[in-house]
């Protein structure tokens, strides 16, 4: 048995198949895109927002962050807030310079948590759209109407090729639990063929 890792099950259109996939499976693969998501993190000396009785959690419809969380490790240092920039905001955010992106995030965190947010000791960002093996995040999204036509092929093996990934889950699609259960399903299918 040979296993290989490729992009998410729906997002395998950067992989060359020989022989080529059957028509309906190939059409499904071509019609699965990814969401646009960037993860940002600001690191502070300490989680100062807790001293103000704040949780470090924020939800916003503004720009750029749509949701932020306190991601500080146990204890009192460092303080870490991470957030997600998604959809249209992520595409707009990507057009800014690195300094402009950092400034936009810090300005929004300052609105949430006050002046202590103005001077993080570090700042990180990851654009999942720029990652070779994901090309986006958080989950594969079929084009409008394509799932009704090609969806039945999503979990169907192609010869010895079995599909697994959160997009192929029958429950908890889009979550880690779905990814695990789909991996178990695909493994059981492959074992049954031995």
Predicted segments with their positions:
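Central helical "cap/lid" subdomain
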Residues: 1-52, 116
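Conserved flavin/dinucleotide-binding core of flavoenzymes
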Residues: 14, 31, 36, 51-194
């Amino acid at each position: 048995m040979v296993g290989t890792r490729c992009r998410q099950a729906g997002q395998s259109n950067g992989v060359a198949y020989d022989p080529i996939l059957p028509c309906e499976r190939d059409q499904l693969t071509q019609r699965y895109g990814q969401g646009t998501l960037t993860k940002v993190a600001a690191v502070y000396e300490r989680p100062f927002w807790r001293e103000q009785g704040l949780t470090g959690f924020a939800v916003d419809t503004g720009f750029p962050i749509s949701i932020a969380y306190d991601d500080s490790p146990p204890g009192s240092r460092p303080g870490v807030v991470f957030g997600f920039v998604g959809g249209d905001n992520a595409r707009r955010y990507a057009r800014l310079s690195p300094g402009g992106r950092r400034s936009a995030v810090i300005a929004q965190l300052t609105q949430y948590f006050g002046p202590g947010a103005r001077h993080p000791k570090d700042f990180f960002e990851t654009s999942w759209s720029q990652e070779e093996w994901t090309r986006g995040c958080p989950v594969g999204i079929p084009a409008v109407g394509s799932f009704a036509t090609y969806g039945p092929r999503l979990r169907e093996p192609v010869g010895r090729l079995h599909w697994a990934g959160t997009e192929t889950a029958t429950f908890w699609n889009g979550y880690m639990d779905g990814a695990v259960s789909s991996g178990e399903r695909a493994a059981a299918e492959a074992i049954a063929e031995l």
